[in-house]
């Protein structure tokens, strides 16, 4: 069993190092960086803070009009959305939020502060403060931000004009996939590392080295590649270094997994079978008005996502009453980075209510 465990984690780490948008470095998953024009556009954004739900959340905004709110996932920050925000700022107040635990937002140290129900309440209070009470808004979300957005739509459908999800696991389908799909269980093994169940020889996160981590990440992999391509400027690179170097930001991001038992399900044959708690959709959606989402919803999905396999799309229409799906067959988990202009156009088109075909290919492609 020990040999199997070592081999599994070694193979998994190597596999994740090879894939384009991610690398596993010292137990931290380092994601790809948003391709964008090399000239600086940061002056277009206004930085601000909102005190909500017992924390101070940083956000960037651009434009005027009804609110469209962008939520990032792990291990990102608001800046991943800058191209989509600029597009939507032509007729919206486009806001990119630093979720709690990230970049310039508060970073509580207790795990309870990262429960999904707490994150949902962050979004509710923030949207009311920035967008106004009793005013509907559009919510765009990715990865962990998407998990929060799914649950938010179940609790507060009356607050949403539209919901746009980009490669983000639906709570109930995620639970099904890690229980029934062996490939998805294997793809989710990195979460054991995130939760502190390290592979032999793996080093735990050292928050005193965040500047070193941030600098190393930004000078290797896709950050450096995008700079060399001319999509990113040195100013863009430095923004990511600064975000990843914030004290507590590494642990803050990992606490999303730890607080919500984001583990593949317990079973006797799993190499980490001593972990008795796993993801519970029932727990994270408790108190929802309805687990069937009636808000008009667009799901954008990069089909080559190595972490969230396409099985997450199978049967999604049973949980979402008004669903449209846009597939990107050659993109991965970071489709909004790889296809930033196309995704911005998708968001624009869907928000404007233009004819957006309800693709059905995902039902066959997902299995």
Question: Which residue ranges define each predicted feature?
Answer:
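N-terminal secretory signal peptides that target proteins for export/translocation
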Residues: 1-16
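Conserved HGGG/HGGXW glycine-rich cap/lid loop of the alpha/beta-hydrolase fold
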Residues: 61-104
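Active-site helix-initiating loop/hinge in glycosyltransferases
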Residues: 73, 115, 338-339
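Short, hydrophobic alpha-helix immediately C-terminal to the catalytic nucleophile
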Residues: 82, 150-154, 344
């Amino acid at each position: 069993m020990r040999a199997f465990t070592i081999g599994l984690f070694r193979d998994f780490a190597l596999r994740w190092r090879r894939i384009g948008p991610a690398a596993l470095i010292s137990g931290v998953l380092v994601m790809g960086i948003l391709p964008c024009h090399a000239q600086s556009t940061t002056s277009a954004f206004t930085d601000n803070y909102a005190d909500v739900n017992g924390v101070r959340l940083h956000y960037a905004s651009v434009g005027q009009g009804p609110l469209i709110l962008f939520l990032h996932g792990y291990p990102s920050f608001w800046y991943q959305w800058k191209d989509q925000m600029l597009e939507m700022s032509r007729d919206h107040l486009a806001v990119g939020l630093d979720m709690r635990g990230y970049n310039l937002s508060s970073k509580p140290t207790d795990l309870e502060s990262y429960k999904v129900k707490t994150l949902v309440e962050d979004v509710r209070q923030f949207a009311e403060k920035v967008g106004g009470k009793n005013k509907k808004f559009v919510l765009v979300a990715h990865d962990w931000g998407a998990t929060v957005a799914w649950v938010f739509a179940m609790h507060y459908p009356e607050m949403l004009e539209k919901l746009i999800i980009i490669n983000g696991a639906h709570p109930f389908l995620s639970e099904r996939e890690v229980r029934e799909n062996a490939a998805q269980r294997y793809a989710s093994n990195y979460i054991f590392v995130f939760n502190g169940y390290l592979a032999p020889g793996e080093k735990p996160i050292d928050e005193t080295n965040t500047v070193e981590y941030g600098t190393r990440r930004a000078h290797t992999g896709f950050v450096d590649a995008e700079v060399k391509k001319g999509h990113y400027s040195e100013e863009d690179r430095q923004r990511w270094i600064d975000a990843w170097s914030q004290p507590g930001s590494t642990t803050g991001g990992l606490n999303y997994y730890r607080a919500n038992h984001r583990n593949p399900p317990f079973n006797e044959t799993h190499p980490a079978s001593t972990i008795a708690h796993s993801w519970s959709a029932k727990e994270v959606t408790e108190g929802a008005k309805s687990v069937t989402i009636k808000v008009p919803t667009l799901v954008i999905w990069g089909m080559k996502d190595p972490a969230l396999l396409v099985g997450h799309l199978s049967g999604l229409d049973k949980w979402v009453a008004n669903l449209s799906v846009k597939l990107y067959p050659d993109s991965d988990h970071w489709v909004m980075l790889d296809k930033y202009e196309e995704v911005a156009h998708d968001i624009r088109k869907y928000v404007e209510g233009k004819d957006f075909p309800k693709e059905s290919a995902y039902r066959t492609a997902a299995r």
